[in-house]
Amino acid sequence: MNIHEFGKENKKIILLIHPSVVKWDYFEVVIPLLQENYHLLVPALPGYDFENDSDFSSVEQIALELNGWIKANGYTEIYAVYGCSMGGSIALMVTLGQMIKIKHCIMDGRITPYQLPWIVTRFIALKDYLMMMIGRTGGVALLEKAFATDDYSKEDLQYVADVLRHCSRKTIWRTFDSCNNYKVPESVPKLSTQIHYWYAEGEEKERKLDINYMKRKFPQTKFEVLPKLGHAGLVLLKPELFAEMIDKLG
Protein backbone atom coordinates (compact mmCIF):
# COMPACT_ATOMS: atom_id res chain seq x y z
CA MET A 1 0.00 0.00 0.00
CA ASN A 2 1.37 3.42 -0.95
CA ILE A 3 1.39 5.94 1.91
CA HIS A 4 1.92 9.59 0.96
CA GLU A 5 3.57 11.74 3.64
CA PHE A 6 3.53 15.51 4.08
CA GLY A 7 4.91 17.79 6.80
CA LYS A 8 7.31 15.12 8.07
CA GLU A 9 9.12 17.67 10.21
CA ASN A 10 6.08 18.09 12.48
CA LYS A 11 5.52 16.11 15.68
CA LYS A 12 1.74 15.56 15.60
CA ILE A 13 0.77 12.82 13.16
CA ILE A 14 -2.61 12.66 11.42
CA LEU A 15 -3.75 9.66 9.38
CA LEU A 16 -6.25 10.67 6.66
CA ILE A 17 -8.30 7.84 5.13
CA HIS A 18 -10.35 8.58 2.03
CA PRO A 19 -13.89 7.33 1.24
CA SER A 20 -14.81 4.92 -1.53
CA VAL A 21 -14.97 5.85 -5.23
CA VAL A 22 -12.20 8.45 -4.87
CA LYS A 23 -8.40 8.38 -4.72
CA TRP A 24 -6.06 9.60 -2.01
CA ASP A 25 -6.02 13.03 -3.69
CA TYR A 26 -9.50 13.53 -2.21
CA PHE A 27 -7.46 15.35 0.46
CA GLU A 28 -5.45 17.56 -1.92
CA VAL A 29 -7.29 20.75 -0.88
CA VAL A 30 -6.76 20.25 2.87
CA ILE A 31 -3.16 19.00 2.73
CA PRO A 32 -1.71 22.54 2.27
CA LEU A 33 -3.85 23.75 5.20
CA LEU A 34 -2.57 21.06 7.57
CA GLN A 35 0.98 20.20 6.57
CA GLU A 36 2.54 23.25 8.20
CA ASN A 37 1.49 22.04 11.65
CA TYR A 38 0.96 18.29 11.24
CA HIS A 39 2.75 15.28 9.83
CA LEU A 40 0.20 13.79 7.44
CA LEU A 41 -0.06 10.14 6.42
CA VAL A 42 -2.39 9.70 3.44
CA PRO A 43 -2.77 6.10 2.24
CA ALA A 44 -3.79 5.25 -1.30
CA LEU A 45 -6.17 2.41 -0.49
CA PRO A 46 -5.93 -0.83 -2.49
CA GLY A 47 -8.26 -0.83 -5.48
CA TYR A 48 -8.26 2.98 -5.61
CA ASP A 49 -4.55 3.53 -6.26
CA PHE A 50 -3.87 4.42 -9.89
CA GLU A 51 -0.15 3.73 -9.32
CA ASN A 52 -0.69 0.21 -8.01
CA ASP A 53 -2.70 -2.48 -9.77
CA SER A 54 -4.48 -3.93 -6.74
CA ASP A 55 -7.95 -4.82 -5.49
CA PHE A 56 -9.74 -3.69 -2.36
CA SER A 57 -9.52 -6.41 0.29
CA SER A 58 -11.64 -5.55 3.34
CA VAL A 59 -12.05 -2.90 6.01
CA GLU A 60 -10.41 -5.18 8.59
CA GLN A 61 -7.46 -6.20 6.39
CA ILE A 62 -6.64 -2.64 5.36
CA ALA A 63 -6.80 -1.47 9.00
CA LEU A 64 -4.39 -4.26 9.94
CA GLU A 65 -2.00 -3.29 7.13
CA LEU A 66 -2.09 0.39 8.12
CA ASN A 67 -1.34 -0.43 11.75
CA GLY A 68 1.52 -2.67 10.63
CA TRP A 69 2.98 0.02 8.35
CA ILE A 70 2.77 2.70 11.06
CA LYS A 71 4.45 0.47 13.63
CA ALA A 72 7.12 -0.77 11.19
CA ASN A 73 8.05 2.83 10.38
CA GLY A 74 8.69 3.61 14.03
CA TYR A 75 5.66 5.78 14.77
CA THR A 76 4.43 5.14 18.30
CA GLU A 77 1.67 7.74 18.65
CA ILE A 78 -0.95 9.18 16.31
CA TYR A 79 -2.58 12.50 17.15
CA ALA A 80 -5.67 11.80 15.06
CA VAL A 81 -7.06 9.25 12.64
CA TYR A 82 -9.68 10.77 10.32
CA GLY A 83 -11.78 8.72 7.95
CA CYS A 84 -14.73 9.71 5.79
CA SER A 85 -17.54 7.25 5.01
CA MET A 86 -15.71 3.99 4.16
CA GLY A 87 -12.57 5.62 5.55
CA GLY A 88 -14.36 6.13 8.86
CA SER A 89 -14.95 2.39 9.14
CA ILE A 90 -11.24 1.76 8.55
CA ALA A 91 -10.32 4.51 11.04
CA LEU A 92 -12.35 2.81 13.76
CA MET A 93 -10.77 -0.59 13.07
CA VAL A 94 -7.28 0.97 13.14
CA THR A 95 -8.16 2.39 16.56
CA LEU A 96 -9.63 -0.86 17.88
CA GLY A 97 -6.45 -2.68 16.82
CA GLN A 98 -4.66 -0.87 19.68
CA MET A 99 -1.25 -1.41 18.07
CA ILE A 100 -0.33 2.24 18.55
CA LYS A 101 -1.48 5.05 20.82
CA ILE A 102 -4.16 7.18 19.13
CA LYS A 103 -5.45 10.36 20.77
CA HIS A 104 -8.46 11.04 18.50
CA CYS A 105 -10.46 8.86 16.12
CA ILE A 106 -12.76 10.89 13.85
CA MET A 107 -15.42 9.21 11.75
CA ASP A 108 -17.14 11.52 9.25
CA GLY A 109 -20.40 9.98 8.04
CA ARG A 110 -19.08 6.52 8.85
CA ILE A 111 -21.36 3.63 7.91
CA THR A 112 -21.70 1.22 10.83
CA PRO A 113 -22.11 -2.54 10.27
CA TYR A 114 -25.66 -3.48 9.36
CA GLN A 115 -27.57 -5.18 12.18
CA LEU A 116 -29.58 -7.28 9.73
CA PRO A 117 -29.90 -10.93 8.70
CA TRP A 118 -27.04 -12.10 6.49
CA ILE A 119 -29.23 -12.66 3.43
CA VAL A 120 -30.60 -9.11 3.63
CA THR A 121 -27.07 -7.68 3.68
CA ARG A 122 -26.36 -9.65 0.46
CA PHE A 123 -29.22 -7.92 -1.32
CA ILE A 124 -28.13 -4.48 -0.08
CA ALA A 125 -24.54 -5.06 -1.21
CA LEU A 126 -25.79 -6.28 -4.59
CA LYS A 127 -27.96 -3.17 -5.01
CA ASP A 128 -25.02 -0.87 -4.19
CA TYR A 129 -22.73 -2.85 -6.49
CA LEU A 130 -25.16 -2.66 -9.41
CA MET A 131 -25.65 1.09 -8.92
CA MET A 132 -21.88 1.64 -9.09
CA MET A 133 -21.54 -0.60 -12.14
CA ILE A 134 -24.29 1.38 -13.88
CA GLY A 135 -22.49 4.60 -12.92
CA ARG A 136 -19.24 3.21 -14.30
CA THR A 137 -20.90 2.36 -17.60
CA GLY A 138 -23.03 5.49 -17.90
CA GLY A 139 -20.39 7.99 -16.79
CA VAL A 140 -21.18 11.58 -15.87
CA ALA A 141 -24.65 11.60 -17.42
CA LEU A 142 -25.91 8.99 -14.95
CA LEU A 143 -23.87 10.27 -12.01
CA GLU A 144 -25.49 13.69 -12.41
CA LYS A 145 -28.81 12.04 -11.59
CA ALA A 146 -27.38 10.26 -8.55
CA PHE A 147 -25.60 13.24 -6.93
CA ALA A 148 -26.84 16.65 -5.82
CA THR A 149 -25.42 18.71 -8.66
CA ASP A 150 -25.74 21.91 -6.64
CA ASP A 151 -22.96 20.56 -4.42
CA TYR A 152 -20.73 18.84 -6.98
CA SER A 153 -19.49 20.24 -10.28
CA LYS A 154 -19.36 18.35 -13.57
CA GLU A 155 -15.59 18.07 -13.05
CA ASP A 156 -16.17 16.41 -9.65
CA LEU A 157 -18.53 13.88 -11.22
CA GLN A 158 -16.10 13.24 -14.08
CA TYR A 159 -13.47 12.47 -11.44
CA VAL A 160 -15.78 9.90 -9.81
CA ALA A 161 -16.55 8.39 -13.22
CA ASP A 162 -12.82 8.04 -13.95
CA VAL A 163 -12.20 6.34 -10.60
CA LEU A 164 -15.09 3.93 -11.17
CA ARG A 165 -13.69 3.01 -14.58
CA HIS A 166 -10.34 2.25 -12.92
CA CYS A 167 -11.88 0.05 -10.22
CA SER A 168 -12.25 -3.65 -10.87
CA ARG A 169 -15.56 -5.41 -10.34
CA LYS A 170 -13.93 -7.17 -7.39
CA THR A 171 -12.99 -3.84 -5.78
CA ILE A 172 -16.48 -2.41 -6.18
CA TRP A 173 -18.15 -5.52 -4.74
CA ARG A 174 -15.73 -5.88 -1.82
CA THR A 175 -16.01 -2.20 -0.96
CA PHE A 176 -19.74 -2.30 -0.34
CA ASP A 177 -19.86 -5.82 1.05
CA SER A 178 -17.10 -5.08 3.58
CA CYS A 179 -18.29 -1.59 4.55
CA ASN A 180 -21.75 -2.97 5.29
CA ASN A 181 -20.59 -6.07 7.16
CA TYR A 182 -17.17 -5.55 8.80
CA LYS A 183 -16.86 -7.05 12.26
CA VAL A 184 -16.58 -4.82 15.33
CA PRO A 185 -15.70 -6.88 18.44
CA GLU A 186 -18.77 -7.79 20.48
CA SER A 187 -16.93 -6.68 23.61
CA VAL A 188 -15.22 -3.39 22.78
CA PRO A 189 -11.81 -3.05 24.49
CA LYS A 190 -11.25 -0.15 26.85
CA LEU A 191 -10.00 2.80 24.82
CA SER A 192 -7.94 5.83 25.81
CA THR A 193 -8.81 7.31 22.39
CA GLN A 194 -11.44 10.04 22.18
CA ILE A 195 -14.03 8.90 19.62
CA HIS A 196 -15.68 11.55 17.40
CA TYR A 197 -18.61 11.05 15.04
CA TRP A 198 -19.20 13.86 12.56
CA TYR A 199 -22.14 13.88 10.19
CA ALA A 200 -23.56 16.38 7.73
CA GLU A 201 -26.75 18.26 8.41
CA GLY A 202 -28.11 17.02 5.09
CA GLU A 203 -27.60 13.34 5.94
CA GLU A 204 -28.96 13.27 9.50
CA LYS A 205 -31.92 11.08 8.53
CA GLU A 206 -29.73 8.61 6.61
CA ARG A 207 -27.27 8.36 9.53
CA LYS A 208 -29.91 7.79 12.23
CA LEU A 209 -29.14 4.09 12.66
CA ASP A 210 -25.40 4.79 12.60
CA ILE A 211 -25.74 7.48 15.28
CA ASN A 212 -27.78 5.14 17.48
CA TYR A 213 -25.20 2.39 16.97
CA MET A 214 -22.39 4.73 18.08
CA LYS A 215 -24.33 5.85 21.14
CA ARG A 216 -24.94 2.25 22.14
CA LYS A 217 -21.55 0.73 21.29
CA PHE A 218 -19.32 3.74 22.05
CA PRO A 219 -21.15 5.90 24.61
CA GLN A 220 -18.10 8.14 25.03
CA THR A 221 -18.49 9.40 21.44
CA LYS A 222 -18.55 13.16 20.82
CA PHE A 223 -21.02 14.05 18.05
CA GLU A 224 -20.68 17.03 15.71
CA VAL A 225 -23.17 18.20 13.06
CA LEU A 226 -21.63 19.72 9.93
CA PRO A 227 -23.87 22.60 8.79
CA LYS A 228 -25.18 22.98 5.23
CA LEU A 229 -23.38 19.93 3.86
CA GLY A 230 -24.22 16.52 2.43
CA HIS A 231 -22.44 13.19 2.84
CA ALA A 232 -18.63 13.40 2.46
CA GLY A 233 -18.82 17.11 1.63
CA LEU A 234 -16.68 18.61 4.42
CA VAL A 235 -13.20 18.06 2.96
CA LEU A 236 -14.20 18.96 -0.60
CA LEU A 237 -16.55 21.88 -0.02
CA LYS A 238 -15.41 23.41 3.28
CA PRO A 239 -11.69 22.63 3.65
CA GLU A 240 -11.07 25.62 5.94
CA LEU A 241 -13.77 24.40 8.33
CA PHE A 242 -12.20 20.94 8.27
CA ALA A 243 -8.78 22.36 9.20
CA GLU A 244 -10.36 24.47 11.94
CA MET A 245 -12.11 21.43 13.43
CA ILE A 246 -8.85 19.46 13.42
CA ASP A 247 -7.07 22.33 15.19
CA LYS A 248 -9.77 22.43 17.86
CA LEU A 249 -9.44 18.75 18.83
CA GLY A 250 -7.08 19.64 21.66
Name each region found by the language model.
Residues 4-52:
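Conserved HGGG/HGGXW glycine-rich cap/lid loop of the alpha/beta-hydrolase fold
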